[in-house]
């Protein structure tokens, strides 16, 4: 039952008026109720007109960008634009060929998919999701910028129609785009920080020299740039202490070994209850720690133990490898892997059982065998001196942060120096 758009009674009000006219006594009383019903209907129409008027007056803005990657300059522009409109639509533009070239010319660890870029934007603006809307525009087949404005504008207008919004203003930081926006989209153009006075950064600068512009990369995009350094070795090889030292010195994050926490939380602190089905749970818990460390890292994140080590323990204690761990090893590679030789003093902390020299050597060989099997390049630190190990790993990290080549260090060992201390 819909309301009428003209001045005649709504059917429900007409029926109510007829009812009152039939069952209420005098003519004057009937006229009074007809008049009352008419007034109510008139008030409703005025209210409806006010709502429609407000809807028409709503100011809608739009922003276009590749966001490859998104950075704080983009975020600032979006929030400034949002303060000037009632509703803002952010369009993430993609072109398969162009985006592939951008990736190959970058220092990004892996190529972000369209879904990755949409996810960045949706995560950043999730608390304004009813006012800031994220859309995707496919630009494949359209001549490259700055050409192709006519074809591009037609695709944009189609998107506006499909997503049911009509912007009146477009926001941009590129002065050269003002005239084309006005000509091809017929929209008012507002330039936001065109001289880069507040945020002197661009996606191009971040792609090519990410560490130099690290402070401009939001945590959502950092996993595509942050370096991960995995420190692995057998029991009591000094991994955890070394990881903590490195994270503190380089002012960044680390991911602790989740397996120890799993034993305390799920097994009551005793590994005798460990079983084959526990290893995937430990790997998933460790991956959560790694994800958090990378997202909040300062250029580099240190990882205490990798999935190859988890697989080695599974083989050692359960007599066979786990296919889930095999998948984790392949799916989550690390940028740098450092293997500590198992030649430091063995300390029994209640969760260790491979304490004999023979057991330690056998486990070390198993780690090397698995590293070779999965074709993981690694740097082996042989010195039993904790100080030497610390300084040698620091030297590797300095090379990584300076974006120097470390391939000559991989699959080699540092010379033994000093004694255990």
From Swiss-Prot:
Function according to Swiss-Prot or TrEMBL: This enzyme has two activities: nicotinamide mononucleotide (NMN) adenylyltransferase and ribosylnicotinamide (RN) kinase. The RN kinase activity catalyzes the phosphorylation of RN to form nicotinamide ribonucleotide. The NMN adenylyltransferase activity catalyzes the transfer of the AMP moiety of ATP to nicotinamide ribonucleotide to form NAD(+).
Membrane protein topology class: Peripheral membrane protein
GO annotations of cellular component type: cytoplasm; plasma membrane
The UniProt record lists the keyword rRNA processing: no
Span list, region Ribosylnicotinamide kinase: 225-421
BP-aspect Gene Ontology terms: NAD biosynthetic process
Protein name from the UniProt record: Bifunctional NAD biosynthesis protein NadR
Effect of residue 256 to F: No effect on enzyme activities, but NAD feedback inhibition is almost lost
Top-rank EC class of the record's enzyme: transferase
Known partners and oligomeric status: Homotetramer.
Native organism: Haemophilus influenzae (strain ATCC 51907 / DSM 11121 / KW20 / Rd)
Region (Nicotinamide mononucleotide adenylyltransferase) residue spans: 57-224
Location (main, coarse): membrane
InterPro entries: Cyt_trans-like, NAD_biosynth-regulator, NAD_NadR, NadR/Ttd14_AAA_dom, NadR_NMN_Atrans, NMNAT_NadR, P-loop_NTPase, Rossmann-like_a/b/a_fold
Residues involved in NAD(+) 1 binding: 64-67, 71, 98, 139-152, 172-174, 199-201
Annotated keywords: ATP-binding, Cell membrane, Cytoplasm, Kinase, Membrane, Multifunctional enzyme, NAD, Nucleotide-binding, Pyridine nucleotide biosynthesis, Transferase
Effect upon mutating residue 238 to N/S: Complete loss of RNK activity, no effect on NMN adenylyltransferase activity
Molecular-function GO terms, alphabetical: ATP binding; nicotinamide-nucleotide adenylyltransferase activity; ribosylnicotinamide kinase activity
Compartments it resides in: Cell membrane; Cytoplasm
Pathway: Cofactor biosynthesis; NAD(+) biosynthesis [regulation]; Cofactor biosynthesis; NAD(+) biosynthesis; NAD(+) from nicotinamide D-ribonucleotide: step 1/1
């Amino acid at each position: 039952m819909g309301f009428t758009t003209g001045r005649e009674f709504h059917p429900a009000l007409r029926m109510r008026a007829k009812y009152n006219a039939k069952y209420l006594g005098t003519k004057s009383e009937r006229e009074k109720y007809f008049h009352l019903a008419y007034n109510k209907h008139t008030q409703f129409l005025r209210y409806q007109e006010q709502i429609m008027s407000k809807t028409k007056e709503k100011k809608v803005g739009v922003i276009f960008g590749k966001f490859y990657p998104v950075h704080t300059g983009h975020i600032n522009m979006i929030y400034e634009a949002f303060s000037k409109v009632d509703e803002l639509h952010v369009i993430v533009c993609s072109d398969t060929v162009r985006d592939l070239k951008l990736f190959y010319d970058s220092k990004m660890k892996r190529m972000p998919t369209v879904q990755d870029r949409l996810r960045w934007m949706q995560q950043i603006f999730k608390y304004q999701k009813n006012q800031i809307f994220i859309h995707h525009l496919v630009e494949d087949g359209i001549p490259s910028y700055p050409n192709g404005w006519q074809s591009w504008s037609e695709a944009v207008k189609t998107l506006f129609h499909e997503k049911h919004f009509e912007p009146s203003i477009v926001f941009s930081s590129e002065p050269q785009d003002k005239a084309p926006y006005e000509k091809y989209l017929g929209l008012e153009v507002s330039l936001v920080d065109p001289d880069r006075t507040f945020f002197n950064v661009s996606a191009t600068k971040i792609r090519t020299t990410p560490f130099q512009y690290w402070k401009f990369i939001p945590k959502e995009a950092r996993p595509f740039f942050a370096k991960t350094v995995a420190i692995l070795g057998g029991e009591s090889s000094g991994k955890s202490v070394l990881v903590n030292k490195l994270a503190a010195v380089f002012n960044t994050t680390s991911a602790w070994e989740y397996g120890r926490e799993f034993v305390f939380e799920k097994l009551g602190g005793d590994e005798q209850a460990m079983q084959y089905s526990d290893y995937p749970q430990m790997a998933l818990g460790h991956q959560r720690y790694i994800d958090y460390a990378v997202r909040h890292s300062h250029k580099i994140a240190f990882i205490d133990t990798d999935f190859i080590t988890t697989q080695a323990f599974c083989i050692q204690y359960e007599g066979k490898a786990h296919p889930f761990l095999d998948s984790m090893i392949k799916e989550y590679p690390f940028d740098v892997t450092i293997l500590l030789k198992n030649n430091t003093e063995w300390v029994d902390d209640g969760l260790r059982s491979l304490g004999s020299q023979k057991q330690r050597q056998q486990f070390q060989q198993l780690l090397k065998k698995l590293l070779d099997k999965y074709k993981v390049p690694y740097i082996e630190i042989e010195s039993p001196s904790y100080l030497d190990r610390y300084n040698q790993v620091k030297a590797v990290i300095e090379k990584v942060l300076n974006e120097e080549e470390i391939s000559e260090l991989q699959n080699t060992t540092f010379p033994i120096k000093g004694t255990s201390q």
